[in-house]
Amino acid sequence: FLSLIPHAINAVSAIAKHN
């Protein structure tokens, strides 16, 4: 599960950067 957290943060970060 801990391995999923960084991936989710990376996705949110990419979305925020794109926006």
From Swiss-Prot:
Source organism, top-level taxon: Eukaryota
Annotated compartments: Secreted
Residue positions, PTM Asparagine amide: N19
GO terms, biological process: defense response to bacterium
Protein's UniProt keywords contain Cell wall biogenesis/degradation: no
Keywords for this protein: Amidation, Amphibian defense peptide, Antibiotic, Antimicrobial, Secreted
Expression across tissues: Expressed by the skin glands.
Gene Ontology annotations for the cellular component aspect, listed alphabetically: extracellular region
Role noted for this protein: Has antibacterial activity against the Gram-positive bacteria S.aureus and E.faecalis and the Gram-negative bacteria E.coli and P.aeruginosa. No hemolytic activity.
Family: Belongs to the frog skin active peptide (FSAP) family. Phylloseptin subfamily.
Name assigned to this protein: Phylloseptin-H1
Species of the source: Pithecopus hypochondrialis
Lineage: Eukaryota, Metazoa, Chordata, Craniata, Vertebrata
